[in-house]
């Protein structure tokens, strides 16, 4: 079939009308007769592809069935344009092999292609060498510019897939380094509580020193200005703690003072109450005494009146000047 497609330079149309006629002609009406594939070359090709693992697991497309028949490398007939025929055969081979390089034609994702390429690195190396050889061979001829472009795009696809596979292979190493760094981080985290405990234990002597430096009485009696002057150079936490302690002590002193004042006032009031009750009792006694005196004086008065009336009645006849005489 490749030999039938290979045309000599004299058979190629040159006029625009002929080219337009060829373009308008429907070539799909004709059946293309396929030549039988050489058994030894197809078997070697299949064995080479299967050795590294199948590129696709779908039953609709297999490496052996999708590989086009290899070109015939028979000796060119004299006078038929051997150089251009070789270029046309190479172009036909590369356009057919493009199905293997296109992942969409095979029906799998780029991730599947990367996994397949990782599992078959040897196959990729051999195919890369073969593609480069075909690219150099097609670029050597004068009429192989189109084949060189197709092969260049194929080589670009292969190199891109190889780079993706290398990047994916390098990813586990990166994670491995992260796993190596994690234990160190854990050690740091485990060491941090110890450092905090050491800092806390180191802070306790500071607490004891400040507590010994300022007694409760000094904190209560010391003014705020003097306390701030004494606490220069001390950490903020210690200053807050001491001021809170001073406030607590002063509040406690205020509460005790108020309680004492209330007790004292209660005692005073109770004493005054007792004194007043004593005065009331004394006044009651005075009242009773005065009542007795009054009664005595009244009785005496009544006696005097009665005795005086009798005396006046006996002497009224002899005394005409008395009031009863004129009546």
UniProtKB/Swiss-Prot annotation:
Compositional bias (Low complexity): 54-65, 72-82, 314-327
Function statement: Acts as a transcriptional activator or repressor.
Cellular component terms per the entry's GO annotation: nucleus
Protein family (similarity comment): Belongs to the bZIP family. Maf subfamily.
Compositionally biased intervals (Basic residues): 172-191
Taxonomy, superkingdom: Eukaryota
Compartments, as annotated in UniProt: Nucleus
SUPFAM superfamilies: A DNA-binding domain in eukaryotic transcription factors, Leucine zipper domain
Keywords: Activator, DNA-binding, Nucleus, Repressor, Transcription, Transcription regulation
Domain bZIP positions: 241-304
Subunit structure: Homodimer or heterodimer. Binds DNA as a homodimer or a heterodimer.
Record-linked InterPro entries: bZIP (IPR004827), bZIP_Maf (IPR004826), bZIP_sf (IPR046347), Maf_TF_N (IPR013592), TF_DNA-bd_sf (IPR008917), Transcription_factor_Maf_fam (IPR024874)
GO molecular function terms attached to this record: DNA-binding transcription factor activity, RNA polymerase II-specific; RNA polymerase II cis-regulatory region sequence-specific DNA binding
PROSITE patterns reported for this sequence: BZIP (PS50217)
Region of interest (Leucine-zipper), residue spans: 269-290
Full protein name: Transcription factor Maf
Pfam family membership, one: Maf_N
Stretches for region Basic motif: 241-266
Region named Disordered: 54-84, 167-209, 308-327
Gene Ontology terms describing biological process: regulation of transcription by RNA polymerase II
Gene3D superfamilies reported for this sequence: 1.20.5.170
Organism: Danio rerio
């Amino acid at each position: 079939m490749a030999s039938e497609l290979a045309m000599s330079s004299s058979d190629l149309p040159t006029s625009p009308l002929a080219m337009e006629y060829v373009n308008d002609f429907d070539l799909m009406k004709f059946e293309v007769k396929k030549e039988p594939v050489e058994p030894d070359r197809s078997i070697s090709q299949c064995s080479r592809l299967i050795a590294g693992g199948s590129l696709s697991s779908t039953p609709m497309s297999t490496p052996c069935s999708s590989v086009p028949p290899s070109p015939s490398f028979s000796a060119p007939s004299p006078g038929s344009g051997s150089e251009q025929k070789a270029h046309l055969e190479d172009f036909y081979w590369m356009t057919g092999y493009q199905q293997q390089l296109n992942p969409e034609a095979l029906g799998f994702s780029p991730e599947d292609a990367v996994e397949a390429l990782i599992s078959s690195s040897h196959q990729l190396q051999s195919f890369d060498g073969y593609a480069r050889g075909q690219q150099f061979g097609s670029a050597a001829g004068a009429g192989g510019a189109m084949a060189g472009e197709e092969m260049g795009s194929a080589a670009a696809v292969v190199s891109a897939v190889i780079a993706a596979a290398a990047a994916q292979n390098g990813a586990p190493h990166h994670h491995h380094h992260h796993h190596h760094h994690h234990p160190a981080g854990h050690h740091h985290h485990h060491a941090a509580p110890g450092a905090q405990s050491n800092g806390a234990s180191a802070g306790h002597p500071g607490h004891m020193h400040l507590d010994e430096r300022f007694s409760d009485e000094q904190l209560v009696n010391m003014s705020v200005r003097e306390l701030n002057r004494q606490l220069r150079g001390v950490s903020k936490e210690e200053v807050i703690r001491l001021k809170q302690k001073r406030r607590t002590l002063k509040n406690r002193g205020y509460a005790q003072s108020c309680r004492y004042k209330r007790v004292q006032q209660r005692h005073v009031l109770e004493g005054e109450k007792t004194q007043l009750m004593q005065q009331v009792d004394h006044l009651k006694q005075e009242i009773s005494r005065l009542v007795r005196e009054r009664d005595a004086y009244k009785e005496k008065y009544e006696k005097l009146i009665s005795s005086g009336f009798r005396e006046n009645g006996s002497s009224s006849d002899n005394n005409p000047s008395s009031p009863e005489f004129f009546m």
